[in-house]
A protein has these predicted regions:
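Primarily secretory-pathway and cell-envelope proteins
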Residues: 20-74, 107-153
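Short, surface-exposed beta-strand/beta-hairpin micro-motifs centered on an aromatic residue
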Residues: 89-95
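Bacterial N-terminal signal peptides that target proteins for export
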Residues: 1-7
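N-terminal signal peptide c-region/cleavage motif recognized by signal peptidases
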Residues: 14-18
Length: 153
C-alpha cells in the first residue's frame, strides 16, 4: 500500500505537468485511479498497474469500444460502499483489501453489475470487464485490446 501511495503521488506530479489530468482518489483503505482516454493517461495507468489489485474496464457493443464517463460503485461482500466515482476513461485501477466485491456501473441509462474477488497481491490485478450496449463508433476508439488480453462479453 505504501508503494501505491508513492506511485500515486508520482502520477499526480506527472498529471500536473501535462494537459491530461488523472484523478487519484482515496476512501478508507481503498485507492483508485481512472482514465485511459488519451495516450498520456494510458501511459500513466500502465505505470500504476504494478501496484493495483483490481482493474475495471468499461466497453461498449460487440466490438468493445472503450467508454468514458461511467458512474460506478464498488461494494464489499456485506453491501457496504468501498468506493464510488465516475470513470473519466475506460480503465480504473483499484487497490482494495482481499475479499469479495460487487461493482455496479451505469452509462447513459444502461446499468451493468459484476462480482469479483481480490485474492492477489498488488501487481497482478484481477480484471473485470463491464460491457454496455451501444455503437462502438460513438465511443473512444478501440485500442489493441487483443494485446491487453481484454475479453469482451
Amino acid at each position: 500500500m505504501k508503494h501505491f501511495r508513492i506511485i500515486l503521488a508520482s502520477a499526480l506530479a506527472i498529471a500536473a505537468t501535462n494537459a491530461t489530468a488523472i484523478d487519484v482518489n482515496t476512501t478508507g483503505s481503498a485507492q483508485w485511479v481512472c482514465g485511459g482516454a488519451g495516450e498520456q493517461e494510458r501511459i500513466q495507468l500502465k505505470g500504476l498497474e504494478s501496484e493495483a489489485t483490481t482493474e475495471l474496464m468499461f466497453v461498449s457493443g460487440k466490438r468493445g469500444g472503450y467508454l468514458a464517463d461511467v458512474d460506478f460503485v464498488v461494494r464489499d461482500h456485506k453491501g457496504g460502499t468501498e468506493l464510488q466515482g465516475r470513470a473519466g476513461g475506460p480503465k480504473c485501477l483499484l487497490t482494495v483489501p482481499a475479499g469479495r466485491y460487487r461493482v455496479d456501473a451505469s452509462h447513459e441509462g444502461a446499468k451493468r453489475s459484476a462480482n469479483f474477488q481480490v485474492t492477489r497481491a498488488p501487481g497482478n490485478p484481477t480484471r473485470t470487464v463491464l460491457t454496455f450496449p451501444g455503437d462502438p463508433s460513438e465511443t473512444i476508439a478501440p485500442l489493441a485490446q487483443e494485446k491487453a488480453g481484454v475479453k469482451v462479453k
